[in-house]
Amino acid sequence: MKPFADLFQTADWKNEKHSPAIEVPERVKKGEDFQVKVTVGKEIPHPNTTEHHISWIEVYFLPQGGRFPFQIGRFEFTAHGESTEGPNTSTVYTKPEVVLFFRTEKPGTIYAFSYCNIHGLWANQIELGVE
């Protein structure tokens, strides 16, 4: 049996359409809200069809020296063109891109996870500096 952590795939988001791209300032001010943007398919668009799509993105923050991460957001994408008339008939599609805000007083690591219904779990991370 594989450990759950081994199910996550990683790759440079500039070359892989499944890897979540995380955009944050290099440094943020202690205790002030800042923006985090996570996109799947930023450089290479990911298909968004009934048959092949991104189902969700989760974002976590692990403060430096912390033992456990904090979940700071979970976002589900539920419109992939399906309707009562069949697959890819509704013309309604959600884009796997989210923007959220949070604040911290400690530097740490932001983690983003995404799930493709065909290619499984994907992960990325970025360091966050605090001044």
Protein language model regions, located:
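Short, compositionally biased P/S/T/A/G/V-rich stretches that sit at domain boundaries
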Residues: 1-29
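Extracellular Ig-like/FN3 beta-sandwich strand-entry sites
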Residues: 33, 105-111
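Short acidic/polar inter-strand loop motif in beta-rich domains
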Residues: 115-125
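Aromatic sugar-binding surface patches on proteins
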Residues: 88-99
